[in-house]
Amino acid sequence: MDNDVKLGRFISLILRHKPETINLKLDKNGWANTKELIEKISKSGREIDFEILERIVNENNKKRYSFNEDKTKIRAVQGHSIEVNLELKEVVPPAILYHGTAFKTLESIKKEGIKKMSRQHVHLSADIETAKNVATRHSGKYIILEIDTEAMLKENYKFYLSENKVWLTDFVPSKFIKF
C-alpha cells in the first residue's frame, strides 16, 4: 500500500470518526482547518504538506473529501460516525437504488431492514457496479440488494445525495428491498 493510500485512510479516520486522535476540532458541519490538520498530522509522525493533502483529495477515487472554496477548510463528504451537519438537501432519487453488503448480513436485513449502524446514514448506490465495489471491500461473499425508493418516497422517507454521489437515507425497511 503506497503512502498516499495509508495517509488517506488516516485522514478518513480523523475527519469521519476520531478527530481526537490528533487533538483536532471539527466545526458543527465537519470542517477542519486545513493548516491545523496538516500540522497535527505532521506532529503524529506522518509526512504531509499542503501539496500531498491536495493530491490525496483530488486523486481519491471515492471523492471522500472536499475543500471549501479557498481551501482553508477540509471535510469528509459522508460516512461519519460522529455527529456533524453536512447541510445536505433533500433530493428525489432514481426509482431504484442499490445496496451492496456482505452476504452474512442478509438474514438480519430481511428481519430488520438496512440500518445506518454506527454511521449517520445508510449508504446507497445509483448503479450495481458501485454497490458491488462497496460490498467487496471487506468480504468476498456479497449480495446486491435492490431498493424501491419510489415506494419509500410515497411513505415520506427522505433521501440526500452527498458531494461524491452516494445516496443517503436514515433507514431502509425490508419491505422496500428486493431480495
Curated annotation (Swiss-Prot):
Pfam families: PTS_2-RNA (PF01885). This is Probable RNA 2'-phosphotransferase. Signal peptide: none annotated. The lineage of its organism: Bacteria, Fusobacteriati, Fusobacteriota, Fusobacteriia, Fusobacteriales. Keywords: NAD, Transferase. The keyword Plastid does not apply. Belongs to the KptA/TPT1 family. PANTHER family: PUTATIVE PHOSPHOTRANSFERASE, TRNA 2'-PHOSPHOTRANSFERASE 1. It comes from the Bacteria. The keyword Metal-binding does not apply. Removes the 2'-phosphate from RNA via an intermediate in which the phosphate is ADP-ribosylated by NAD followed by a presumed transesterification to release the RNA and generate ADP-ribose 1''-2''-cyclic phosphate (APPR>P). May function as an ADP-ribosylase.
